[in-house]
Amino acid sequence: MRILAIDPAIRNTGYAVVEGDYRRARALDYGTLSIPRSVSQSGCLLAIKQHLGNLIDKWNPDEMAVERIIYVQSHQTAITMGAAKAAVVIAAAEAGLRIMEYSPKSVKLSVVGRGAAQKTQVAFMVRALLELRETPESDAADALAIGLTHLFSADPLKAHMMERKYI
């Protein structure tokens, strides 16, 4: 199975394309879509949607996995994060992709074994599990972890631990 995994944010959206199953996975592509502060919010949303559309065209994923927005610092941040996530969902919907959403705690539990793991621990485990040469930067590591979580969710021994839902 090939998964496009997204860690949505208005300025730095992490993305990853992972392939495999709950026993073995490999990273095909990953990175961060970084958008300068000079770009308007609407311009950011368009850039996110277009970038994801390009990734979908290039990699032809079977499904998409995204991180659920749980904690935000303010109402304005919640609105901005929601808009970024909407751009992600629209790109997936246009391509007819099924979208699965995972809580941050489920992602950490799946990849590290602790729901309260630190970002550095997640990045370390992503590097180890995918046998990457270098530790990915934070947003890309989060997207890779989301993709791994989706693949791991097919494991009957782990599926019960994950907070997930289709959107």
From Swiss-Prot:
GO terms for molecular function: crossover junction DNA endonuclease activity; DNA binding; magnesium ion binding. Mg(2+) 1 binds at D7, D139. InterPro entries: RNaseH-like_sf, RNaseH_sf, X-over_junc_endoDNase_RuvC. It is found in: Cytoplasm. Its EC number is 3.1.21.10. Binds 2 Mg(2+) ion per subunit. It catalyses: Endonucleolytic cleavage at a junction such as a reciprocal single-stranded crossover between two homologous DNA duplexes (Holliday junction). GO terms for biological process: DNA recombination; DNA repair. GO terms for cellular component: cytoplasm; Holliday junction resolvase complex. Pfam families: RuvC. Keywords: Cytoplasm, DNA damage, DNA recombination, DNA repair, DNA-binding, Endonuclease, Hydrolase, Magnesium, Metal-binding, Nuclease. It comes from the Bacteria. Mg(2+) 2 binds at E67. The active site is at D7, E67, D139. Its cofactor is Mg(2+). Its main location: cytoplasm. It is an enzyme of class 3 (hydrolase). Belongs to the RuvC family. NCBIfam families: ruvC (TIGR00228). The RuvA-RuvB-RuvC complex processes Holliday junction (HJ) DNA during genetic recombination and DNA repair. Endonuclease that resolves HJ intermediates. Cleaves cruciform DNA by making single-stranded nicks across the HJ at symmetrical positions within the homologous arms, yielding a 5'-phosphate and a 3'-hydroxyl group; requires a central core of homology in the junction. The consensus cleavage sequence is 5'-(A/T)TT(C/G)-3'. Cleavage occurs on the 3'-side of the TT dinucleotide at the point of strand exchange. Homodimer which binds Holliday junction (HJ) DNA. The HJ becomes 2-fold symmetrical on binding to RuvC with unstacked arms; it has a different conformation from HJ DNA in complex with RuvA. In the full resolvosome a probable DNA-RuvA(4)-RuvB(12)-RuvC(2) complex forms which resolves the HJ. This is Crossover junction endodeoxyribonuclease RuvC. It comes from Akkermansia muciniphila (strain ATCC BAA-835 / DSM 22959 / JCM 33894 / BCRC 81048 / CCUG 64013 / CIP 107961 / Muc). The lineage of its organism: Bacteria, Pseudomonadati, Verrucomicrobiota, Verrucomicrobiia, Verrucomicrobiales.
